[in-house]
Amino acid sequence: MLVRRGARAGPRMPRGWTALCLLSLLPSGFMSLDNNGTATPELPTQGTFSNVSTNVSYQETTTPSTLGSTSLHPVSQHGNEATTNITETTVKFTSTSVITSVYGNTNSSVQSQTSVISTVFTTPANVSTPETTLKPSLSPGNVSDLSTTSTSLATSPTKPYTSSSPILSDIKAEIKCSGIREVKLTQGICLEQNKTSSCAEFKKDRGEGLARVLCGEEQADADAGAQVCSLLLAQSEVRPQCLLLVLANRTEISSKLQLMKKHQSDLKKLGILDFTEQDVASHQSYSQKTLIALVTSGALLAVLGITGYFLMNRRSWSPTGERLGEDPYYTENGGGQGYSSGPGTSPEAQGKASVNRGAQENGTGQATSRNGHSARQHVVADTEL
């Protein structure tokens, strides 16, 4: 029986002795045997401290490794918890690192160590949180390769938060109040108010809100400070509740009308009930003196026109005011009554008429005697006939 047991134990004995020989051949600096026969790695520890970046500063120590190589992990010197202050743009980040070591016993193998680092950041609402990525690389530990677990920490840079919405305080608007008679432009938008107020009062109370509605989107598209929004307001003389927004051209008027329709609820909060495109001239009132002057000028022009019309129709009048072809007898006898020789006329009247005709034919206008000779001598002309 003893021989059989020795024969059976014979093949097993070299395997046990081989394992003991291999363990005894290991360097004393890396491995040591305890009383139970379990191999325990002796881990050298080296501590170093360095600054990672210009804006982020924290302390670093090394994690022990069985091969003598060190890997950097952000831990503290005094315990498992560390507080790290990261200063960038006057914002403080609080980082807490906790290291948990897990040991596992395996037969004929080296204990593997795994470090888990958890980082907690406390940040304000408007500041972006830096992203922390843990990249573990795990490999089983055994006698042949003598490797341990290492964990690397990667931190992304912090970017400041930028809001895309336009800041209302950066809107630069200039509102001018002008008289309706001083405006040289012809087109505008009538802002119908819920109550009568002057241009100065509207500018003081609700001018900022109107500039926010009409100039907010324009300055959001343009660069900051590159353009100043200018608005020209004029008080209507015909309708006191209408405040005219005078614009340069029809293209600008159409764009403003579309913008007002889009923000109609905001305009109602400002007391603007309605808005329509109207002419500037229709809101100018004329004074009483102007009306009197216009009526007087029209009356004088009418009188002069009527007088000229009648003067042009009277062709018998010369420019000097004398009638053409007149003689004293024609005037005395009612305009040519002496020329007619009716049956009831006397012979003396017929004789006078013939005398007058003879005088007109001679062109002298002087009465001739009955014997054919005139009482006055004829004037001889200077030139020969």
UniProtKB/Swiss-Prot annotation:
Annotated GO molecular function terms are: carbohydrate binding; RNA polymerase II-specific DNA-binding transcription factor binding; sulfate binding
Tissue-by-tissue expression: Selectively expressed on hematopoietic progenitor cells and the small vessel endothelium of a variety of tissues.
Gene Ontology CC entries for this record: apical plasma membrane; basal plasma membrane; cytoplasm; external side of plasma membrane; extracellular region; glomerular endothelium fenestra; intercellular bridge; lysosome
Task: Provide Extracellular-side residue ranges.
Answer: 32-290
Keyword vocabulary terms for this entry: Cell adhesion, Glycoprotein, Membrane, Phosphoprotein, Signal, Transmembrane, Transmembrane helix
Membrane topology, as annotated, equals: Single-pass type I membrane protein
Can you tell me which residues the record assigns to a coiled coil? none
One of the GO BP terms on file: tissue homeostasis
Signal peptide position in this chain?
Answer: 1-31
What ranges are annotated Cytoplasmic (topological domains)? Answer: 312-385
Modification sites for Phosphotyrosine: 329, 339
Q: Where is carbohydrate linked to this protein?
A: 36, 51, 55, 85, 107, 126, 142, 194, 249
Renumbered residue ranges of the record's region Disordered: 127-159, 321-385
Q: Residue spans with biased composition (Low complexity)?
A: 144-159
Q: Where in the cell is it found?
A: Membrane
Q: Which InterPro entries match?
A: CD34 (IPR008083), CD34/Podocalyxin (IPR013836)
Chief location bin: membrane
Protein modification: Highly glycosylated. Phosphorylated on serine residues by PKC.
Q: Where are the transmembrane segments?
A: 291-311
Q: Which Pfam families match?
A: CD34_antigen
Mark the residues carrying the PTM Phosphoserine.
346
Give the family this protein belongs to, as stated in its UniProt record: Belongs to the CD34 family.
The role this protein plays is: Possible adhesion molecule with a role in early hematopoiesis by mediating the attachment of stem cells to the bone marrow extracellular matrix or directly to stromal cells. Could act as a scaffold for the attachment of lineage specific glycans, allowing stem cells to bind to lectins expressed by stromal cells or other marrow components. Presents carbohydrate ligands to selectins.
Protein's recorded name: Hematopoietic progenitor cell antigen CD34
Organism name: Homo sapiens
Q: Which gene encodes it?
A: CD34
